[in-house]
Amino acid sequence: MSIAIKRAYEEPSDDDGYRVLVERLWPRGLKKEAVPLDQWAKELAPTTELRKWFGHDPALWDGFRHRYASELDGLAEYWQPLAERSVRHKVTLIYGAHDEEHNGALVLRDYLQHWLRTHGPA
């Protein structure tokens, strides 16, 4: 299983595999043609309400992780195909946040990896 995360502002690499933007909003200051993607999975991003509540405040990180995981619980139709793809092919979750330690892509990656370890692909 191979699920990586990468900032949208980083150079794409041949090693990225299947590139999926996991943000509801396009990353600021980037032209769409500058960010090669295989998929833009807006549905997998935290809700606007949760994103605004979190505001990238590290003090709210634990609460954000739990709330976002709860949102993901109801979105299997969107994340399960990515998890299953990652069993055979590398998937890179692309995110726009500047904070590399507190962002939704980290939570999503951990969520997918946990699901694969405990349930396995369908």
What are the language-model segments listed below?
Residues M1-A122:
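Residues lining hydrophobic/aromatic ligand-binding pockets adjacent to catalytic sites
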